[in-house]
């Protein structure tokens, strides 16, 4: 099993501790594909870092091992001074993988063509994202975590990435944190909502969407009231 038990995560601010996750529980099997609806600023990135073992909770327990989960959109490991190919081969070497096979997969998936041998510092944001996605797909892990979105690029690129991910997901789990119900409908079979620092699992996507939309409606009402005034 993998997840969090009674985990709290907070950050100090000028007004005191800001609680992002509040004694939340979230436990899943390694082959499950779970979509969690979460509004911007609700703690998606904080949750991702906890589940990937990058941060430790202030309270509670993390279930699993560091390296079990991989943040699918992470690109901080990409070195701008190296070429795309050199970055791919470097990561393959670090994990003891075949450099030729690893690099060939990244070249085919990204379709960077001649840019694959250019320095990453010359890449656009999208090109760098595609390279990172390809590399992440081949790194050893037991499940992927996507914070916000899964793919970028034109339709052809997204179809290639979707097919490559689907192949990996035959043996690996997936957690998608997003505000878009359509995204998790396509890729997940269990659904939840991140509200008020806690994850609430739902019976189906319809229930999760209704709960999420109700929360957004309530937040919009509160913001409107905050800006109301008498004339």
Curated annotation (Swiss-Prot):
List of residues binding ATP: 38-45
GO terms assigned for molecular function: ABC-type transporter activity; ATP binding; ATP hydrolysis activity
Major location category of this protein: membrane
Gene Ontology terms: cellular component: plasma membrane
A Gene Ontology BP annotation from the UniProt entry: polysaccharide transport
Domain ABC transporter positions: 5-221
Protein role: May form an ATP-driven Vi polysaccharide export apparatus, in association with the VexA, VexB and VexD proteins.
Membrane topology annotation: Peripheral membrane protein
Protein's organism: Salmonella typhi
UniProt keyword annotations, A-Z: ATP-binding, Cell inner membrane, Cell membrane, Membrane, Nucleotide-binding, Polysaccharide transport, Sugar transport, Transport
Localization annotation: Cell inner membrane
Record's protein name: Vi polysaccharide export ATP-binding protein VexC
Gene3D superfamilies: P-loop containing nucleotide triphosphate hydrolases
Family, similarity comment: Belongs to the ABC transporter superfamily.
Annotated Pfam families: ABC_tran (PF00005)
